[in-house]
Amino acid sequence: MPEALAQELAFPGGVIWQVTLDPPPAQLPAFDDRSAYLVLRDGHVRAVDHATGGTRWTAPASSTVRPASSGRHLVGADGVTAWAIDADSGREAWRRDIGSTAAAVPAISPAGAVFLTEQGDLVLLAWVDGHEVWRARMPAPVSAPVVAGPDHVFVGLDDGHLLAIRLGDGATAWTKTLGARILEMTSIGDRLFAGASDNFLYALKPKDGHLAWRWRTGGDVAGLAVADQRRVYFTSLDAMLRAVDRRHGDLRWQRPLTTRAVGGPTLAGTQIIVSGVAPELHAFRASDGGMTATAPLPGRPLHGPFLAPEHASAPLRLVLLTAGGHLLAIGQTVEPRLVPLDGLPGKKLPPEVLPVIKR
């Protein structure tokens, strides 16, 4: 999951490019370092170069869940049929029947794509050809998007249990009981952060599930967390943005938001960007939480913004989809560079000679 990039984002900056889709996409977009992927309502998937806003390719595919990208493959599912598309060319890589309708966005792991079915099965499909590596039945309804780490898949259940499933064989490595229904999880380095409906953010050690710390808020912790080397940043349904010590969980600062957050915050260098139900983004200083800028949007944001890496043809930028089908990139807008002319443009004309007027 994302940690801070070295470059600093120019915020609020301006709109680098904008694409309007009518009708809007059927699912929230997937992102990787090169593209944004949109599931269109006409049975196609479009890859948009998020440096320029241009279409890289369009492929015939539908998905009843939000897709996900590994950088090499884009994966999704149309009902019971899971599929993978080559992210570079747009060609279909494979299709597989997973036995039951896909229930959530697939998790991206080193071993393959992990799908959750409506029957409660977790299914790992290999990257190479989509064959089923293992299948594991969950003991209770899954309440949070599945998250993959280097060695485990983490599953949050409606009854408050958090499971670590081994990627190698699908067996349960450990189980931890939290205080309530698990809503969201984020795996960052040596910590697994879990938000729950008891208003706590929990920090666990991924290798054994040991509880490192927890912090109570005034509302459900329903969004992803982000972290730098010192602090963890997260929002909750009490419309607050908080920073806590990454190692010990002590509160460093908290700031009220003007609206309820949509998705989790985005960390860009020394700034934290938060989207809400209003058509705008807000930036806060990571050091003390002071709000520094606001950027207007053409519609209500549908997810937390994706931080796209700096490219030869584009600066560091935020990419997001808003209500109304507006996909846009926000960052530093660069005017064309001024260069000296080798010669004057146009055709050389002889000097005009005015007639002599006799009086």
Residue ranges of model-derived segments:
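Short loop/turn and low-complexity linker motifs enriched in small/turn-promoting residues
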Residues: 7, 17, 280, 290, ...
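Charged, low-complexity, helix-prone segments enriched in Lys/Glu/Asp/Gln
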Residues: 8, 93, 133, 212, ...
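Short loop/turn segments that connect beta-strands within beta-propeller blades
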Residues: 49-52, 86-89, 126-130, 166-170, ...
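Repeat-blade elements of multi-bladed beta-propeller folds
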Residues: 22-44, 59-83, 87, 96-123, ...
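A short beta-strand motif characteristic of beta-propeller blades
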Residues: 14-19, 54-59, 91-96, 131-136, ...
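Sequence/structural signature of beta-propeller modules
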Residues: 1-10, 339-359
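A short helix->beta-strand "capping" segment at the edge of beta-propeller domains
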Residues: 4-23
